[in-house]
Amino acid sequence: MDFIPGSITAQTTMHFLPGWKKQGLSLPTADEWAYLCGGGCRTLFPWGDGLDYSMRLRWFEDMDEDENRPYDMEEPNFFGLSIAYDPYMREVVQADRLTTCGGDGGCNICGGLGPFLGFLPCSPHCKPEVQEDNELNGDYDFYRPIIRLENYD
């Protein structure tokens, strides 16, 4: 099966999984993804239950041309992961059906709902989204293979 950008499907996902398994990799489950995203915190976002409106947020703030740093949400969390920092980007997780976490494809932002509701899909507590049409967008959807430590005694 050839990989065609913009046409990632459940079948494409199934195509990659055996190769990852041979390398000791797999996709996180939705619960594992939420734990990784939250950095072990029990709040709505890794930094607390509200949105700090002084943060520089992608899609709402432009960086000055001389600034060579990531947007605030792109900074690594307590686990050192840059995860769930862009509401347009969704991560495929391991599930019985094609499921994503970490974004809504930008629906809330494009719908004009503002920064808080725009970034709410990036919360580790946002419900995983089953992709009913079994299709993913190659520009916004991606995989984060993980190594399960239980595999290494």
Task: Please state what every model-predicted region is.
Residues 1-112:
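Functional-site microenvironments in short loops/helix caps that host divalent-cation chemistry
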Residues 18, 132-137, 151-153:
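Cysteine-nucleophile amide-bond enzymes
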Residues 28, 134, 139, 143:
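Single, functionally critical "micro-switch" positions that shape active/binding sites
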Residues 94-136:
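Alpha-helix capping/hinge segments and adjacent helical runs
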Residues 140-152:
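Short, structured beta-strand segments at or near domain termini in extracellular proteins/domains
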